[in-house]
């Protein structure tokens, strides 16, 4: 059974504090937008899909007990608070896209004379809550599409179409139930391979400096009893040389229109090594992680985190006092290194991504 990182019922929101994992499992109440901003910014909740869901639901929790005299005041509250939430972690595009959708909805409802203030509030709450269920459904579709793509590629490479043997895969950072509403994106692909009986082994990187792989992905894999091994970030090249890894599958915080992908720091170097060893490299991401307004990775804003995340583990200093640090939270993997981008609507080559997504948006 997958872990539950988000607990929600109308008027109440709790998140599993991921800074305490894997030692302590503790849920934190999120009573409104200020709490939502803080848990996102402090990375007590993380993963682009989860950030968007928690951010939007924190506003739903805040608005639920409030009374608004006019639709205009409700619209202004929604717009102002959502724009504030976007600032908590700007690299992850999902929060911005979700905020824009909800702001558009609020504007449309406020202009509709047939909609009362109470109706407008109700429909806003319904829309935010629908995001939770949609994310889980999208993740399951991503898992199915990704597993199929990997198995088909392996079968083709081994000359045995339709009958691929169980595979070994590598994943980076955390993209499972803890990073989404449930099931996961890249880890959802791993889960689906397991459900098909086609997962021989999954390797997860520690993912320094925040150790999301060691603390969170390993926690999920052990919880679900999947065959898994933790490796250091610096071991990936050696792993590819000796362990016959069939594919790499990672998540994404933002995918540009040309397929360039911003993801957790360390993703780029894994893609370079995968290319050298001929290992297919897949990005698993919902459409909400794809930003067609960004032409390439050069235009993606990369969040830089505090030095302390590198110099300390918990309260213990591990680096020499006085040393300078450079701590970007993400890097950008060029589209040329990406085999395919796995979405809930299929697997697309980076070169055709923009046109394929544009077609889907038109439907």
UniProtKB/Swiss-Prot annotation:
Keywords of this protein's UniProt record, alphabetized? Answer: Amino-acid biosynthesis, Cytoplasm, Isomerase, Methionine biosynthesis, Nucleus
Catalyses which reaction(s):
5-(methylsulfanyl)-alpha-D-ribose 1-phosphate = 5-(methylsulfanyl)-D-ribulose 1-phosphate
Query: Superkingdom, according to UniProt?
Result: Eukaryota
Q: What's the stated role of this polypeptide?
A: Catalyzes the interconversion of methylthioribose-1-phosphate (MTR-1-P) into methylthioribulose-1-phosphate (MTRu-1-P).
> Which taxonomic lineage does the organism of this UniProt entry have?
Eukaryota, Metazoa, Ecdysozoa, Arthropoda, Hexapoda
- Active site per UniProt: 253 (proton donor)
Which Pfam families does this entry report, sorted A to Z? IF-2B
Alphabetically, which GO biological process terms does the record hold?
A: L-methionine salvage from methylthioadenosine
Statement: the UniProt record of this protein carries the keyword Nucleus: yes
Site annotated as Transition state stabilizer: where?
173
Q: Which GO terms describe its molecular function?
A: S-methyl-5-thioribose-1-phosphate isomerase activity
Its Enzyme Commission number(s) read: 5.3.1.23
Pathway(s) where this gene product acts: Amino-acid biosynthesis; L-methionine biosynthesis via salvage pathway; L-methionine from S-methyl-5-thio-alpha-D-ribose 1-phosphate: step 1/6
Q: Which organism is the protein's source?
A: Drosophila grimshawi
Q: Which GO terms describe its cellular component?
A: cytoplasm; nucleus
- Which compartments is it annotated to reside in? Cytoplasm; Nucleus
Q: To which protein family does this belong?
A: Belongs to the eIF-2B alpha/beta/delta subunits family. MtnA subfamily.
| Broadest EC class assigned to this enzyme | isomerase
Q: Which InterPro entries match?
A: IF-2B-related, IF-M1Pi, IF_2B-like_C, Initiation_fac_2B_a/b/d, M1Pi_N, NagB/RpiA_transferase-like
Q: What is this protein called?
A: Methylthioribose-1-phosphate isomerase
Q: Does the keyword Amino-acid biosynthesis apply?
A: yes
């Amino acid at each position: 059974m997958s872990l539950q990182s988000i607990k929600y019922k109308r008027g109440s929101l709790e998140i599993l504090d991921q800074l305490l994992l894997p030692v302590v499992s503790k849920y934190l109440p999120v009573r409104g937008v200020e709490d939502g901003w803080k848990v996102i910014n402090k990375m007590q909740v993380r993963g682009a899909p989860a950030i968007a869901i928690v951010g939007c639901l924190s506003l739903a929790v805040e608005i639920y007990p409030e009374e608004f005299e006019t639709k205009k005041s409700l619209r202004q509250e929604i717009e102002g608070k959502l724009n504030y939430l976007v600032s908590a972690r700007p690299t992850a595009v999902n929060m911005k896209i979700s905020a824009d959708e909800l702001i558009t909805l609020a504007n449309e409802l406020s202009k509709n004379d047939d909609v009362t203030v109470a109706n407008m509030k109700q429909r806003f709450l319904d829309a935010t809550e629908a995001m939770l269920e949609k994310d889980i459904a999208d993740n399951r579709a991503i898992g199915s599409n990704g597993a199929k793509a990997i198995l088909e590629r392996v079968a083709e490479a081994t000359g045995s179409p339709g009958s691929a043997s169980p595979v070994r895969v590598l994943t980076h950072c955390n993209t499972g139930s803890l990073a989404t509403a449930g099931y996961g994106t890249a880890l959802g692909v791993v889960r689906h391979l397991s459900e098909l009986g086609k997962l021989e082994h999954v390797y997860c990187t520690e993912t320094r400096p925040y150790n999301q792989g060691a603390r969170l992905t390993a926690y999920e894999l052990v919880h679900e009893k999947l065959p898994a091994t933790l490796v250091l970030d610096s071991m990936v090249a050696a792993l590819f040389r000796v362990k016959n890894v069939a594919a790499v599958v990672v998540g994404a915080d933002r995918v540009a229109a040309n397929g360039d992908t911003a993801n957790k720091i360390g993703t780029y170097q894994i893609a370079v090594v995968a290319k050298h060893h001929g290992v297919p490299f897949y990005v698993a991401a919902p459409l909400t992680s794809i930003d067609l307004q960004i032409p390439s990775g050069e235009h993606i804003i990369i969040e830089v985190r505090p030095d302390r995340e590198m110099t300390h583990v918990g309260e213990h200093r591990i680096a020499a006092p006085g040393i300078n640090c450079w701590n970007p939270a993400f890097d950008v993997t060029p589209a040329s290194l990406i085999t395919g981008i796995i979405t809930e609507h299929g697997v697309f080559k980076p070169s055709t991504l923009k046109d394929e997504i544009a077609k889907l948006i038109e439907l």
